[in-house]
């Protein structure tokens, strides 16, 4: 169970997004965003084995896609946290921003919060308040049919193996960077030891050679 995809948009204009795995998220999300009214509201759409949860506030839509067995309270907890961070960071700038204007910065925030709320099940249950439970009861769940441009029924297609490939690449990259960092650290340490050794030998030998210029040891 996980949050598979998250997006922040103004109407159908996507401002930032992050996907946990491969899939036709954008194609499906564009249709979902087009169906969301501009007034403040919260709703969950059900489509096949997936749920689309969203919060719309001040024309900005915070939306995530989850498996149908993922707890709705955790999904809306994620969306509320994303909304708070986005509003704090960008404020009214989001009302006039160009498509993907916040993606380079905010996609990493989406990734971190997506990971946190997907993995920390016990924490969410402990911190969940009665007010949150009552709020969730008021959020409706509606079935939705999606139609592709060709007129065919549109299905959300997920490729979770892509996440495994990405994780493998990330692991290899991290290992390579770690090895490089350790090599640089060892070179620096060796250089420091050599310099300290030379200085130490110089200090020890100088009195025996008549001073710091070694007059009795250096032949003129």
Swiss-Prot record:
One of its GO terms (biological process) is endoplasmic reticulum to Golgi vesicle-mediated transport. Residues 125-185 form the v-SNARE coiled-coil homology domain. GO terms for molecular function: SNAP receptor activity; SNARE binding; syntaxin binding. Residues 7-110 form the Longin domain. InterPro entries: Longin-like_dom_sf, Longin_dom, Synaptobrevin-like, Synaptobrevin-like_transport, V_SNARE_CC. It is a single-pass type IV membrane protein. It holds the Pfam family Longin. The modification Phosphoserine is found at residues 167-168. Keywords: Acetylation, Coiled coil, Cytoplasmic vesicle, Endoplasmic reticulum, Endosome, Exocytosis, Golgi apparatus, Lysosome, Membrane, Phosphoprotein, Protein transport, Signal-anchor, Synapse, Synaptosome, Transmembrane, Transmembrane helix, Transport. It is found in: Cytoplasmic vesicle, Secretory vesicle membrane; Golgi apparatus, trans-Golgi network membrane; Late endosome membrane; Lysosome membrane. Gene3D superfamilies: 1.20.5.110, Longin domain (3.30.450.50). The chain crosses the membrane at residues 189-209. Residues 210-220 are vesicular. The modification N-acetylalanine is found at residue 2. Expressed in brain, kidney, liver, lung, spleen and thymus. Not expressed in heart and skeletal muscle. Residues 2-188 are cytoplasmic. GO terms for cellular component: apical part of cell; azurophil granule membrane; cell surface; cytoplasm; endoplasmic reticulum membrane; filopodium; Golgi apparatus; hippocampal mossy fiber to CA3 synapse. Belongs to the synaptobrevin family. Involved in the targeting and/or fusion of transport vesicles to their target membrane during transport of proteins from the early endosome to the lysosome. Required for heterotypic fusion of late endosomes with lysosomes and homotypic lysosomal fusion. Required for calcium regulated lysosomal exocytosis. Involved in the export of chylomicrons from the endoplasmic reticulum to the cis Golgi. Required for exocytosis of mediators during eosinophil and neutrophil degranulation, and target cell killing by natural killer cells. May interact with STX17. Component of the SNARE complex composed of STX4, SNAP23 and VAMP7 that binds SYT7 during lysosomal exocytosis. Component of the SNARE complex composed of STX7, STX8, VAMP7 and VTI1B that is required for heterotypic fusion of late endosomes with lysosomes. Interacts with PICALM. Interacts with RAB21. This is Vesicle-associated membrane protein 7. The lineage of its organism: Eukaryota, Metazoa, Chordata, Craniata, Vertebrata.
């Amino acid at each position: 169970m996980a949050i598979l995809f998250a997006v922040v948009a103004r109407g159908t204009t996507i401002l930032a997004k992050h996907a946990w795995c491969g899939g036709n998220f954008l194609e499906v999300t564009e249709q979902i965003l087009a169906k969301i009214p501009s007034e403040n509201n919260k709703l969950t759409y059900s489509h096949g084995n997936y749920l689309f949860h969203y919060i719309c506030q001040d024309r900005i839509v915070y939306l995530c896609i989850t498996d149908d067995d993922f707890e709705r309270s955790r999904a809306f907890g994620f969306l509320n946290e994303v909304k708070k961070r986005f509003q704090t960071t960008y404020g009214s700038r989001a009302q006039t921003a160009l498509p993907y204007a916040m993606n380079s910065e905010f996609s990493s925030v989406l990734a971190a919060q997506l990971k946190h709320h997907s993995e920390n099940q016990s924490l969410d249950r402990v911190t969940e308040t009665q007010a949150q439970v009552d709020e969730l009861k008021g959020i409706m769940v509606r079935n939705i049919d999606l139609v592709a441009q060709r007129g065919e029924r549109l299905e959300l297609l997920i490729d979770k193996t892509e996440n495994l490939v990405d994780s493998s690449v990330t692991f290899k990259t991290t290992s390579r960077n770690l090895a490089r960092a350790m090599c640089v650290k060892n070179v620096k340490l060796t250089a420091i030891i050599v310099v300290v050794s030379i200085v130490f030998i110089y200090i020890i030998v100088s009195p025996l050679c008549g001073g710091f210029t070694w007059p009795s040891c250096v032949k003129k």
